[in-house]
């Protein structure tokens, strides 16, 4: 009879089993959270009420029942000293009881989770793809996300080195240029970027022989379209043209670099980005002082970005050269020396001979003619032009009178 009744009972499906397991797991998780809240509540109440009772008892004993003898005082103070130890013991007992309940709850929770994991593995092996997908979406969304993340390939993040370009662009022709003459089948067209030098074809016609076919077959095009992660024909090439106007600072900086930047007053927060006005590309960063006066050529579209302001120039100072002054004074001295007669030049020598013969033992007498000679030599170049001017004026007066 029991066998017949057992046959009539239907076996629960996997969905029903998973639903019951989910319900039990949620109940256990709620019980664990509730248990932790109760532990905090009971411990807090114990400490609060025990401390309040302890203070009231101490006050009552001190003012009402505190005896005068020291022996009686010690006996009365013993319960007051033992009460804090009793409260700490009760606190440890509460923590121990609640921790035991939490451990039992965690054991049951782990058992239910292992049962659920086994059922899900059986579902993935036995059920169809559609049913398995629905069950996983409903009862195990985390494993589904992990499976999708493992299925989709992740491209490695390439960090550029200091000497490499951060990004590489291949700018297509935005407007059709002028129509050129018919080209030979062996040559490749040139692409010109706005504002910069022409860019060679990506296929590299110089490296391929003249008879080789440069057009891709339809099968190669289909393979490239099916694989989105395959590199393009010119992805490994460096775009021609000038480098960046200013170096781009590294994004990952250490503590020492930040301290140095703070002391020096340099860093990304103290710089402005150089953005191209045509293609809006990042061309490095410039200091605040030179940002308004920097003119740069874009490294991607080769457009010349003019400076926002012109740097003010200070007025030019007059040049002073000591050599020019000496050169300007030298013709006057030469002309004055040429006008001197040989008699005048020999006169100081005769005076020196006379003074030395007259007083040979007096050094002061020897120095005096020398000083007089130097004074006469300095005064002669100034007196000679004045005498010439007077002679010319007298000659003019005589001519007018005649």
Swiss-Prot record:
**Keyword Endoplasmic reticulum in annotation:** yes
Zinc fingers (C4-type): which spans? 276-301
List the membrane topology term(s). Multi-pass membrane protein
Recorded GO cellular component terms are: endoplasmic reticulum membrane; endoplasmic reticulum tubular network; endoplasmic reticulum tubular network membrane
Q: What S-S linkages are listed for this chain?
A: none
Location in the cell reads: Endoplasmic reticulum membrane
Provide the GO MF annotations for this entry: identical protein binding; zinc ion binding
Q: Name one GO biological process term.
A: endoplasmic reticulum tubular network maintenance
Q: What the entry says about post-translational processing?
A: Phosphorylated. Phosphorylation occurs during interphase. Phosphorylation also occurs during mitosis; these phosphorylations reduce both its homodimerization and the ER three-way tubular junction formation.
From the record, what ranges are coiled-coil?
100-128
> Bias regions of kind Polar residues — which residues?
205-222
Q: Where does the UniProt entry say this protein principally localizes?
A: endoplasmic reticulum
> What are the start and end residues of every segment in region (Disordered)?
142-240, 311-402
The Swiss-Prot or TrEMBL note on domains reads:
The transmembrane domain 1 and 2 function as a signal-anchor and stop-transfer sequence, respectively, generating a double-spanning integral membrane protein with a N- and C-terminal cytoplasmic orientation. Transmembrane domain 1 and 2 are probably sufficient to mediate membrane translocation and topology formation in a N-myristoylation-independent manner. Transmembrane domain 2 is sufficient to block the protein secretion pathway. The two coiled-coil domains are necessary for its endoplasmic reticulum (ER) three-way tubular junction localization.
The family annotation for this protein states: Belongs to the lunapark family.
Q: How does it assemble?
A: Homodimer; homodimerization requires the C4-type zinc finger motif and decreases during mitosis in a phosphorylation-dependent manner.
The name this protein carries in UniProt is Endoplasmic reticulum junction formation protein lunapark-B
Species of provenance: Danio rerio
Q: Which gene encodes it?
A: lnpkb
């Amino acid at each position: 009879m029991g066998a017949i009744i057992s046959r009539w009972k239907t076996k629960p499906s996997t969905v029903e089993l998973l639903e019951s397991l989910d319900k039990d797991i949620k109940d256990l998780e709620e019980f664990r959270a509730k248990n932790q809240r109760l532990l905090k509540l009971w411990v807090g109440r114990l400490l609060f009420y025990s401390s309040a009772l302890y203070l009231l008892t101490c006050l009552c004993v001190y003012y009402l029942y505190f005896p005068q003898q020291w022996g009686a005082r010690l006996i009365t103070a013993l319960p007051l000293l033992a009460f804090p130890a009793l409260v700490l013991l009760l606190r440890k007992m509460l923590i121990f009881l609640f921790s035991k309940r939490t451990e039992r709850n965690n054991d049951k929770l782990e058992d239910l989770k292992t049962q659920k994991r086994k059922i899900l593995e059986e579902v993935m092996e036995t059920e169809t793809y559609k049913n398995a997908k629905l069950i996983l979406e409903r009862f195990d969304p985390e494993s589904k996300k992990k499976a999708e993340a493992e299925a989709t390939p992740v491209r490695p993040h390439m960090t550029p080195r200091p000497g490499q370009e951060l990004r590489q662009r291949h700018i297509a022709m935005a407007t059709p240029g002028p129509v050129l003459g018919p080209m030979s089948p062996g040559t490749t067209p040139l692409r010109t970027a706005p504002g910069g030098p022409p860019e060679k074809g990506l296929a590299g016609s110089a490296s391929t022989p003249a008879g080789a076919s440069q057009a891709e077959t339809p099968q190669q095009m289909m393979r490239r379209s099916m694989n989105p992660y395959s590199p393009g024909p010119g992805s490994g090439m460096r775009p021609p043209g000038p480098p960046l106007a200013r170096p781009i600072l590294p994004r990952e900086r250490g503590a020492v670099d930040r301290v140095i930047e703070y002391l020096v007053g340099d860093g990304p927060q103290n710089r402005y980005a150089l953005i191209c006005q045509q293609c809006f590309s990042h061309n490095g960063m410039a200091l605040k002082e030179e940002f308004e006066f920097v003119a740069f050529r874009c490294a991607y579209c080769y457009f010349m970005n003019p400076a926002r302001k012109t740097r003010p120039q200070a007025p030019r100072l007059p040049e002073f050269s000591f050599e020019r002054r000496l050169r300007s004074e030298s013709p006057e001295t030469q002309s004055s020396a040429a006008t001197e007669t040989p008699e005048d030049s020999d006169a100081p020598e005769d005076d020196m001979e006379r003074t030395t013969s007259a007083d040979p033992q007096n050094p002061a007498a020897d120095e005096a003619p020398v000083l007089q000679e130097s004074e006469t030599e300095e005064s002669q170049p100034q007196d000679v032009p004045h005498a010439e001017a007077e002679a010319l004026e007298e000659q003019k007066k005589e001519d007018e009178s005649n």
